[in-house]
């Protein structure tokens, strides 16, 4: 006995979405997926209902009203989206496919039924107290979309998305957190979204977003991931790319074509049956190749402030909010874990709690240096601490009028940690090194002022741990001894390189190897 074709098609769609999303909870994902399909079916049924179509005929920007031929609608997020790494299943269909613009109405556009005599902003009269009654049965999940209930949306007026635009609203964002459950079975992260682009296209996108505040301070790897994740969207002439008052999900960069921007006054909808030009509003500006718009949609789901209408065939590059935020969050999560691992290897920080190390890692600032450029110079006052994230560095010391290389540093090594205790002069010069001229040194840095602002004076933290370990009478002595035992340059890295480590300690310029602060033991070792 053969299975119905609709059943087979439904299972194929489910298998496709499961393969894309790779849900941690397959049962919950399937339940949400079928509920979403059921809701789409009910909504499509209502859209074809005669009463609903008649009521909706006078609504501006509806699927059967006058105006632009199509309205771009990317749809909602896929059900069961457990984390941003599952963004591949966020959108179910191509919004620019033929016929996509005039499809089913979005859920957010379905208005709540209300009495004909009640305006959207009016306050209902208080209800007359009634005798206690038995608890009401739970409402059916799709009762508001039609059925046997006493109220039906097919009998209510359809309210345009701009009816409540002037009222104060709350701004919120999706809750997102990187989860190990969304990684591959071997523990590696899910593959990134990469859409091929030519170098010329990459350059045009860089030029369009280079001065945008959202992208200006992105790190190099984040910036590259954002560019690669943008997808190409082709739009015909006279298509509404974004509509004023609709929820925004996408940021666009114009590669080819022209678009006009219109802004409609809040009371334009209530002025009888306006023309198509009145519904669009006043033309404010035109966009051409290299322009960008919709960047606020990358931050939160806020209604669009204007309508953008294509005046010719256009090629756009689109980036959705979930992809953008997940790129930033996944990158920041990996970087934070890397920084915390580095901090655990620094003797001054080994007794900090996990929460304290997390605060420090979040405040570290990334810097880059070209080959031969000095990071710190011998003799200058130190106020910052450095950890090498990528690249190599040389430790140089001036001896008898000449500069000599006394050590080499690489990924994970640190230097300048005593700057968090005092502003003693630097004991050596640390400069970027590399095998090629284009080699780069990437370090993260933290100032003594930032450390004190987050955790308080480092000397106080050392004294606290000494007190916990040795008691009150030894706290100050051991805290000072621990501070004296630290070196301004990572001596472990110098020992590995076989370099001479006998330059004076920065806290005591008169000390010699084996004497004074240089040989002070570490009480926390």
Swiss-Prot record:
The lineage of its organism: Eukaryota, Fungi, Dikarya, Basidiomycota, Ustilaginomycotina. The gene is PKAR. 3',5'-cyclic AMP 2 binds at residue 417. SUPFAM superfamilies: cAMP-binding domain-like (SSF51206), Dimerization-anchoring domain of cAMP-dependent PK regulatory subunit (SSF47391). Belongs to the cAMP-dependent kinase regulatory chain family. Residues 28-213 are annotated as: Dimerization and phosphorylation. Tetramer, composed of 2 regulatory (R) and 2 catalytic (C) subunits. In the presence of cAMP it dissociates into 2 active monomeric C subunits and an R dimer. A nucleoside 3',5'-cyclic phosphate 2 binds at residues 348-472. Pfam families: cNMP_binding, RIIa. This is cAMP-dependent protein kinase regulatory subunit. One of its GO terms (molecular function) is cAMP-dependent protein kinase inhibitor activity. Residues 124-146 have a biased composition (Low complexity). The modification Phosphoserine is found at residue 170. The keyword Transferase does not apply.
């Amino acid at each position: 006995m053969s299975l119905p074709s609709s059943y087979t098609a439904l299972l194929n769609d489910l298998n496709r979405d499961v393969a894309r999303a790779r849900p941690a909870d397959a049962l919950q994902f399937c339940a949400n997926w079928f509920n979403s399909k059921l809701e789409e079916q009910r909504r499509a049924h209502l859209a074809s209902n005669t009463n609903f179509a008649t009521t909706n005929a006078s609504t501006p920007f509806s699927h059967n009203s006058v105006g632009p031929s199509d309205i771009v609608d990317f749809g909602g997020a896929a059900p069961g989206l457990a984390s941003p790494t599952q963004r591949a299943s966020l959108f179910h269909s191509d919004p620019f496919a033929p016929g996509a613009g005039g499809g089913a109405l979005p859920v957010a556009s379905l208005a709540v039924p209300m009495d004909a005599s009640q305006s959207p902003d009016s306050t209902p009269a208080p209800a007359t107290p009634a005798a206690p009654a038995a608890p009401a049965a739970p409402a059916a999940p799709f009762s508001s979309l039609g059925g046997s209930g006493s109220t039906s949306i097919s009998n209510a007026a359809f309210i345009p998305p701009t009816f409540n635009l002037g009222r104060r609203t709350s701004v919120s964002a999706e809750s997102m957190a990187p989860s190990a459950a969304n990684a591959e079975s071997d523990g590696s992260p899910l593959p990134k979204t990469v859409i091929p682009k030519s170098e010329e296209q990459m350059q045009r996108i860089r030029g369009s977003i280079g001065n945008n505040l959202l992208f200006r301070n992105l790190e190099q790897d984040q910036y590259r991931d954002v560019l690669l994740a943008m997808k190409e969207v082709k739009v015909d002439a006279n298509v509404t790319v974004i509509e004023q008052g609709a929820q925004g999900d996408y940021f666009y960069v114009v590669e080819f074509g022209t678009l006009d921007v219109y802004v409609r006054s809040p009371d334009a909808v209530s002025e009888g049956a306006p023309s198509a030009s009145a519904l669009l509003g006043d033309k404010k500006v035109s966009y051409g190749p290299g322009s960008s718009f919709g960047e606020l949609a990358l931050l939160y789901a806020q209604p669009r402030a204007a309508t953008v209408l294509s005046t010719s065939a256009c090629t756009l590059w689109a980036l959705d909010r979930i992809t953008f935020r997940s790129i930033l969050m996944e990158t920041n999560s990996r970087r934070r874990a890397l920084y915390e691992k580095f901090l655990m290897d620094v003797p001054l920080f080994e007794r900090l709690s996990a929460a304290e190390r997390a605060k420090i890692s979040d405040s570290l600032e990334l810097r880059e240096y070209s080959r031969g450029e000095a990071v710190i110079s011998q003799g200058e006052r130190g106020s910052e601490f450095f950890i090498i994230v990528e690249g190599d560095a040389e430790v140089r010391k001036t001896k008898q009028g000449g500069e000599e290389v006394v050590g080499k540093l690489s990924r994970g090594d640190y230097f300048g940690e005593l700057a968090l205790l005092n502003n003693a002069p630097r004991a050596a010069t640390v400069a970027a090194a590399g095998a090629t001229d284009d080699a780069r040194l990437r370090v993260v840095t933290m100032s003594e002022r930032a450390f004190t602002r987050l955790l308080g004076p480092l000397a106080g933290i050392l004294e606290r741990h000494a007190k916990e370990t040795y008691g009150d009478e030894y706290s100050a002595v051991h805290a000072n001894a621990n501070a004296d035992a630290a070196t301004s340059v990572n001596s472990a890295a110098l020992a590995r390189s076989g370099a001479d480590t006998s330059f004076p300690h920065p806290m005591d310029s008169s000390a010699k190897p084996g004497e004074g602060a240089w040989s002070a033991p570490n009480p926390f070792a």
